């Protein structure tokens, strides 16, 4: 349930005479329920009552109409919910409608303040549900335009919206979800190449962020890719991927104790780990005074097979080649290869 019930909710509703009468009746269940709901508004509007300055109760009107209310009750009955919880579900529905209207007004103004207000009221789950729906519609619209969206829309559009929806895209991409309309028509599918690019860019973006400073990492991310586009023009993302393939290590060793002795056993590095290590090397070697330019210079140098990052890779490989004779202990390691 999206909204927490009050402590005295059961005592307030279930011990009333009207409610018991409805539970006993079987034939006129919908009509009797609606009659009770309309007649005893003081019962149903327990959560909406507020006191004025004088001390009198001021009751707010509900947003659901008669027809919508009846349909909602019928749907609950079909789904198999118990009758005694109908009041609760109706109240939940009304509050969610009100919250959506509130969010549409103030979604782009003062996000932090709005978040605090919603969090205090206990609407966190409802807020997430509403916001995710909007973002999925956006991504569906976004991907429908072209296969390579950053080429068709330009760099600014790509950088602006990549950071905003990167996490959502990756979640959808990893589980291989298809974007659908309300009529369940397939809009588009994510290709494997696009998924890999998004994942690699997202890993790099997560590596840049530290202490939750996302705005700073966004600015670094944008400046770096602007510099890359200025030099390499259309193939600026392909250059970044080429750099990762040149730098990433393919082999590494694992330390194991066998018969009371240490052995460094060389193994193949998993793809995800190899890419993440190359990105970590890149970020750690950058100057923290001017990160964007230093990252750009490192990428350019390593594309020419020079620089400190390629030395790291050679050292990594040489350490594993020295312990070549211990490959016979590979059977003791639990690897996916």
UniProtKB/Swiss-Prot annotation:
GO terms for biological process: translation. Pfam families: Ribosomal_S7. InterPro entries: Ribosomal_uS7_bac/org-type (IPR005717), Ribosomal_uS7_dom (IPR023798), Ribosomal_uS7_dom_sf (IPR036823). It comes from the Eukaryota. GO terms for molecular function: rRNA binding; structural constituent of ribosome. Its main location: mitochondrion. Keywords: Mitochondrion, Ribonucleoprotein, Ribosomal protein, RNA-binding, rRNA-binding. GO terms for cellular component: mitochondrion; small ribosomal subunit. It is found in: Mitochondrion. The keyword Secreted does not apply. One of the primary rRNA binding proteins, it binds directly to 16S-like rRNA where it nucleates assembly of the head domain of the small subunit. Belongs to the universal ribosomal protein uS7 family. Part of the small ribosomal subunit. This is Small ribosomal subunit protein uS7m. It comes from Acanthamoeba castellanii (Amoeba).
């Amino acid at each position: 349930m999206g909204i927490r019930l009050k402590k005295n909710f059961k005592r307030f509703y279930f011990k009333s005479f009207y409610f018991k009468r409805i539970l006993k009746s079987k034939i006129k269940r919908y009509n009797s329920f609606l009659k009770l709901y309309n007649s005893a508004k003081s019962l149903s509007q327990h959560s909406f009552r507020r006191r004025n300055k004088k001390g009198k109760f001021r009751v707010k009107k509900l947003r659901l109409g008669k027809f919508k209310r009846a349909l909602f009750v019928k749907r609950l009955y079909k789904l198999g919910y118990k009758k005694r919880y109908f009041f609760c579900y109706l109240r939940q529905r009304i509050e969610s409608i009100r919250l959506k209207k509130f969010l549409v007004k103030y979604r782009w103004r003062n996000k932090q303040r709005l978040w605090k207000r919603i969090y205090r009221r206990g609407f966190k789950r409802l807020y997430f549900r509403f916001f995710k729906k909007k973002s999925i519609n956006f991504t569906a619209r976004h991907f429908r335009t072209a296969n390579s969206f950053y080429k068709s829309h330009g760099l600014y559009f790509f950088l602006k919206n990549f950071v905003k929806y990167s996490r959502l895209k990756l979640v959808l991409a990893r589980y291989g979800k298809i974007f659908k309309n309300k009529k369940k028509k397939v809009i588009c599918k994510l290709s494997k190449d696009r998924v890999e690019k998004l994942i690699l860019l997202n890993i790099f973006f997560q590596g840049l962020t530290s202490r939750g400073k996302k705005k700073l990492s966004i600015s670094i991310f944008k400046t770096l890719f602007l510099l890359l586009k200025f030099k390499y023009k259309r193939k600026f993302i392909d250059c970044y991927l080429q750099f990762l393939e040149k730098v990433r290590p393919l082999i590494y060793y694992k330390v194991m104790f066998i018969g009371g002795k240490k052995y460094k056993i060389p193994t193949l590095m998993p793809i995800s780990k190899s890419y993440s290590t190359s990105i970590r090397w890149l970020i750690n070697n950058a100057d923290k005074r001017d990160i964007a330019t230093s990252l750009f210079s490192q990428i350019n140098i390593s594309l020419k097979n020079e620089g400190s990052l390629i030395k790291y890779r050679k050292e990594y490989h040489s350490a594993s080649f020295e312990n070549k004779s211990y490959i016979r202990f590979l059977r003791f390691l639990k690897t996916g290869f």
